[in-house]
């Protein structure tokens, strides 16, 4: 059944969000059939989106030119978050190998990080790259709590956020005052880092980025479900647009927060949205990994970063 214009599930909670709504576009389901969709990442050269189906141990790919969907990588090592570096190489957070890896043009795989101070990482979850070459990722225990998203195991290190230098091999822990580090992204000017915490804190943190270190960490926002009377929810994957707004996978789909920490809009979805990314040839299409499906909607802004 056709959806009316404007799509009633793209909701302005504040007039400031209306500028981002395109009146004659709708939320589209591009694919369905996964068990737990995660980690969407846009490849601008190939004009495709890659995302993870964690329990099925595969990565999927959607092509922009004809909408074709296929299995991209099987097995995937139970990958979760994905991104691309500034040389176009894919980076993946792998639950199965408890590591972050990079896929080379030759087909080889380079391990970016799998141990911290001699102990195995937990289950790297989400990942972003900085123009200085640094690779930032989160490492909660979600992927080793059972056998559904990889292999049940005891954690050897505390959940944390890390920065890896792929040239030197140096791995630095930058934050560990959390039991559930999850989504991560930079502000458009790379002066701030946002961290979605799905642990006990159930909040988004914001930090000042000081070279390779995080400073002045504080609560950015604690989300609830709009219209629920205050029922709490938590952001999972997060991305920033060129105006500094945070687009967060959070019930009832996606919530949009200003750089000042004010929620202004939401996108309602029929499935739980785990993660998002901007893509398309103009970076003005929001892709949403929603449980069993991949969704997309055009918005009147652009993603701040390449993937």
What annotation goes with each model-predicted range?
Residues 1-26, 305-307:
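Blade/loop signatures of beta-propeller domains
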Residues 206-214, 298-306:
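Short loop/turn segments immediately following beta-strands, especially the blade-tip
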Residues 15-32, 67-75, 103-118, 160-180, ...:
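Blade-edge beta-strand/turn elements of extracellular beta-propeller
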Residues 26, 32-47, 75-94, 99, ...:
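Beta-rich, blade/repeat-based domains predominating
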Residues 56, 97, 151, 155-159, ...:
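A detector of repeated loop/turn-to-beta-strand junctions in beta-rich toroidal repeat architectures
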Residues 19, 44-74:
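Beta-propeller domains
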Residues 58-60, 99-101, 160-162, 203-205, ...:
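A short loop-to-beta-strand structural motif that recurs across blades of beta-propeller domains
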